[in-house]
């Protein structure tokens, strides 16, 4: 689903979602208006509409869904998005940084395509590229620094979560490979090399990373003109996942893939808890039809791991798929209606 229009009931063009959010002892009302073909409108505490990104951080959630398999088996973009989504939760100002980076990247790519079409790099192209390089390096350095920080926060919890969901015979690890250190193609070929290359970047400041990105852009300029696209930067980096030192992509079994994907989400949950450990500040865990994909042992292990969460929402097509330990307040959804268990049609 690429737009929120799919959330609208068939035959309608508008929907309102209202929520009262209590985090620690602070209550906030949030209203989201979804209108077909238009930008979403958001109100906080019934004030004037604000940008949708302004509600980031008000409701912290961690979603487990069948689509999470793409975090392990899919293209590098899925893993980059995982890091960026968590980064925005932990550092909301990074939403604007990422938006700036994407905008500059589009402009720079358009200029490179223009140079390729001209068959040469003119003086005007050179001067304009120098300007875009500075902007791209500045925003890219902040994105990269944030990703490395987030990876440091989830690496330990990832290993612990995978051990808790399995027999613990394989160590789950995550490594970052940056294009400002070596080339990585978007087809994910770098995944056959399990080790990351970010060690030299871990202690680098944003300004130092900016200089390294600038140097990489300069070194690649002729190649970029020939291909009409930006070849280095956070948009081309890769998060490599390994099990027992072996790349998970292409080598992990279906069960291992599921366990690793779930472990990534559990690691992000743990990172949020550590970021704000106040009572009542924990993120909401949403398990969207994941138990149907797990065997009995993994169901029991996952249920045990999430049992201590402050709030857990579970969806399932078959109630028997949900472990008894997670059955609290049960709601049944029928076409056009939601009923408490024991009420409504079929009660």
Predicted segments with their positions:
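Walker B catalytic acidic pair
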Residues: 288-290
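Hydrophobic positions in the central parallel beta-sheet of the AAA+
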Residues: 62-64, 283-286
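Nucleotide-state sensing region of NTPase/ATPase domains
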Residues: 1-78, 82-94, 152-160, 209, ...
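Structural recognition of the conserved hydrophobic beta-strand(s) that form the central parallel beta-sheet
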Residues: 19, 311-317
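Long, non-coiled-coil amphipathic alpha-helical linker/lever segments
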Residues: 3-4, 83, 90-147, 284
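Conserved NTPase motor "head" modules and their coupling/switch loops across ABC/AAA+ ATPases, GTPases
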Residues: 120-284, 293-297, 301-304, 308-309, ...
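Hydrophobic/aromatic beta-strand patches that form the interior of the parallel beta-sheet core
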Residues: 62, 313, 329-331
């Amino acid at each position: 689903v690429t737009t929120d229009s799919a959330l609208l009931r068939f035959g309608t063009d508008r929907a309102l979602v209202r929520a009262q959010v209590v985090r620690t002892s602070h209550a906030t009302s949030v209203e989201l208006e979804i209108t077909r073909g238009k930008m979403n409108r958001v109100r906080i505490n019934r004030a004037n509409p604000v940008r949708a990104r302004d509600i980031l951080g008000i409701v912290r959630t961690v979603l487990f869904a069948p689509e999470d398999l793409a975090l392990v088996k899919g293209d590098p973009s899925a893993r980059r998005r995982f890091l960026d989504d968590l980064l925005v939760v932990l550092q909301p100002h990074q939403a604007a940084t990422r938006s700036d980076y994407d905008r500059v990247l589009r402009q720079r790519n358009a200029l490179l395509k223009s140079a390729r079409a001209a068959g040469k790099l003119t003086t005007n192209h050179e001067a304009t590229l120098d300007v875009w390089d500075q902007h791209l390096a500045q925003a890219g350095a902040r994105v990269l620094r944030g990703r490395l920080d987030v990876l440091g926060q989830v690496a330990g919890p990832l290993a612990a979560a995978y051990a808790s969901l399995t027999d613990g015979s394989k160590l789950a690890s995550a490594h970052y490979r940056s294009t400002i250190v070596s080339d990585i193609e978007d087809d994910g070929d770098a995944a056959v090399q399990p080790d990351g290359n970010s060690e030299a970047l871990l202690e680098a400041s944003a300004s130092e990373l900016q200089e390294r990105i600038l140097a990489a852009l300069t070194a690649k300029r002729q190649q970029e003109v020939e291909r009409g696209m930006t070849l280095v930067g956070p948009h081309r980096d890769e998060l490599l996942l390994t099990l027992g030192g072996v790349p998970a992509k292409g080598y992990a079994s279906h069960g291992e893939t599921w366990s690793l994907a779930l472990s990534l989400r559990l690691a992000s949950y743990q990172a949020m808890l550590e970021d704000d450990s106040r009572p009542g500040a924990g993120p909401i865990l949403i398990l969207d039809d994941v138990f149907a994909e797990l065997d009995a042992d993994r169901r029991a292990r996952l249920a045990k791991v999430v049992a201590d969460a402050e709030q857990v929402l579970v969806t399932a097509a078959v109630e028997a798929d949900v472990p008894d330990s997670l059955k609290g307040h049960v709601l049944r959804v029928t076409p056009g209606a939601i009923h408490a268990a024991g009420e409504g049609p079929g009660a």
